[in-house]
Amino acid sequence: FLAIATIVNIVLDVFFIVSLRLGVSGAALATIIAQALSGFGIMIYVFLTQKDLLPTRQHCHYDIEVFQKIRDYSLLTCIQQSVMNFGILMIQGLVNSFGVLTMSAFAAAVKIDSFAYMPVQDFGNAFSTFIAQNKGANEEERIQKGLKSAICISTIFCLMISFGVVFFAKELMLIFIHPSEIEIIAQGIQYLQIEGMCYLGIGCLFLLYGYYRGVGKPGISVVLTVISLGTRVALAYLFAPTLGQCAIWWAIPIGWFLADFTGIFYGIKKENWLQFNK
């Protein structure tokens, strides 16, 4: 459903912005419609295929312990999402300062970028569920095996996506940008090739998010998000005035890898990851 929402969003962006010339309002409207369709689609799917997830009368009672767990986890998730969106807004503001060409290149490239690593993000969410289920069942061995398998699968997929984005960046940009817009395409290619070379970083980060949420430590996911976004914003604003928009592109993966290092270091020290092979 996320993939459908992304495709619908792209199509509606082109229709509202290019055909109807609604500008920013058109982009916002396209996003709302796409997200609404995705949400309703998921609801209908659950009602039709997952009957056991539907609440019954016996479930309709207040449980303070469950409420507290939901409150604590959701609050941390809200903080994480707020930090992410705030960082994205700051980066967007910096990009806008470079003019219309850079804004257009960034808008097109980010859509491609987001679509490219979307499966890795969803894989991280599924990994979180796997970890949580086995943590609740005290299946430490399965968690260890699952972590190793997840790393292998994510690494292989990220390398494949990196190859496609890096070597076909121009063709991907031409999906959204007219061939005559040479400067926009050039900047978009630069963005995609820099990000594309570093998808291992974002793949690892999504696994770390999923792992720490699954073992009941969502606060660590928030810390990693703050490190990733904080590094991105700080480096972008520090070096963009002298190095240009290229500094913004490089700040993004540097933030990923710094957060990865922090998450892995914590896992080794506190989660005993080095004991997994013993």
Predicted regions: what is each one?
Residues 15-24, 82-111, 115, 133, ...:
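Helix-terminus/linker motif at the lipid-water interface of multi-pass membrane proteins
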Residues 1-11, 25, 29-32, 123, ...:
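Alpha-helical transmembrane segments of multi-pass membrane transporters/permeases
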Residues 19-75, 131-198, 239-278:
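Short alpha-helical transmembrane segments in multi-pass integral membrane proteins
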Residues 105-163, 167-169, 202-224:
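Small-residue-rich hydrophobic transmembrane alpha-helices
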Residues 7-18, 43, 89-93, 115, ...:
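Alpha-helical transmembrane segments of multipass membrane proteins
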Residues 5, 34-38, 42, 46, ...:
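Transmembrane helical elements of multi-pass membrane transporters/channels
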Residues 9, 26, 84-88, 99, ...:
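Functionally critical, cavity-lining and gating residues within the transmembrane helices
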Residues 2, 114, 120, 182-208:
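Alpha-helical transmembrane segments of multi-pass membrane proteins
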